[in-house]
Amino acid sequence: MVDNSKIRVVVGMSGGVDSSVSALLLKQQGYDVVGVFMKNWDDTNDDGVCTATEDYEDVKKVADKIGIPYYSINFEKEYWERVFQYFLKEYKAGRTPNPDIMCNTEVKFKSFLEYALDLDADYLAMGHYAKTMVDENGVTHMMRPKDGNKDQTYFLSQLTQEQIKRVMFPLQDLTKPEVRRIAEEAGLVNAKKKDSTGICFIGERNFKHFLSEFLPAQGGDMVTPDGKVVGHHAGLMYYTIGQRQGLGLGSTKESTAPWFVVGKDLEKNQLIVEQGYDSPRLYADRLQASGMTFFTGNPEEDTEFKATAKFRYRQCDVGVTVKYYAASKTADVYFDEPARAVTPGQALVLYNGEECLGGGNIDAAFKDDKKLQLV
């Protein structure tokens, strides 16, 4: 029988209820648990309050309550170089990035994992809602968790086998209400603390205002696909494919249908808009993705397979056929049915039933072999 007390687990503690309960459960299971708070961003809010300081106070209270040592580590430099610069580069190129995925890949499960191993940890644990399973060959697979509503495999989709084999997800068989109940019964100070939302380095701040601090906005024309000017945009980086809100456009003599963003022309600095949710320009039958990573290891040869996919968080899976090219780690992904608002810069995540296979970054979308969106 395995003696858990000889297995050291470093838990990434954010000050939130999920990571706190993860630490509590591991402690109850007899592991040698060490809590570590990561500071990735100088996140002083608009009131001049550093929210990281408040979160660390919660970490200290929880760690003291459950009886584990705790530390704080600063990864602001790594975050700035590997995540935030990528975020700015993508927006500057007219794409809509997902920095949370890059943060997991480059900071939480890379720099932080290396730090945990330096503390002689056998495993790193997080408060993510995800599940791992080890097969008879010792290969670790990423699976959907019990709580499908909180499933975070989308954000973990670009991790490698070397990373996930060292990770534990204590919440994998729990729902969020169950986690809160455990926290309340244990008397944890953050049992009712609200979940963090949005991009971690923006927090509750206005997105446009935040982005304009780093990327000067350049306004331009809103045009229809045939070039008619119908309005003015505040900067291409503020809009995403399929967006309806915030365009400031009313009905026309021809139609009362709402307007949607259907493309961007970077050379002309034009935002392309069209009326109607079902605009053909919003529907793709294929996408191209790069940086493909598979949890169980990338195939060494070109391969074709059926799967289901998400190309945005909380989206229902859609059926796809994947053509993977081993040399370039790229893929052509063909949709079983035309897919709406496939957005360059976002993540493609592949599934086979309950298993998350991996994913990559969307480079372009196509309809009848014609590139959409002009980005």
From Swiss-Prot:
Q: Which GO terms describe its cellular component?
A: cytoplasm
A biological process (GO) annotation for this entry?
tRNA wobble position uridine thiolation
Q: What's its EC? A: 2.8.1.13
Q: What is its main location?
A: cytoplasm
Name the enzyme group at the top EC level. transferase
Return the annotated site residues (Interaction with tRNA). Answer: 128, 346
Catalyses which reaction(s): S-sulfanyl-L-cysteinyl-[protein] + uridine(34) in tRNA + AH2 + ATP = 2-thiouridine(34) in tRNA + L-cysteinyl-[protein] + A + AMP + diphosphate + H(+)
Q: Which CDD domains match?
A: MnmA_TRMU-like
- Using the chain's own numbering, where are the disulfide bonds? 103-200
GO molecular function ontology, one term from the record: tRNA binding
Q: Which residues form the active site?
A: 103 (nucleophile), 200 (cysteine persulfide intermediate)
Q: What does this protein do?
A: Catalyzes the 2-thiolation of uridine at the wobble position (U34) of tRNA, leading to the formation of s(2)U34.
- Protein name per the record: tRNA-specific 2-thiouridylase MnmA
- Native source organism of the sequence: Lactobacillus delbrueckii subsp. bulgaricus (strain ATCC BAA-365 / Lb-18)
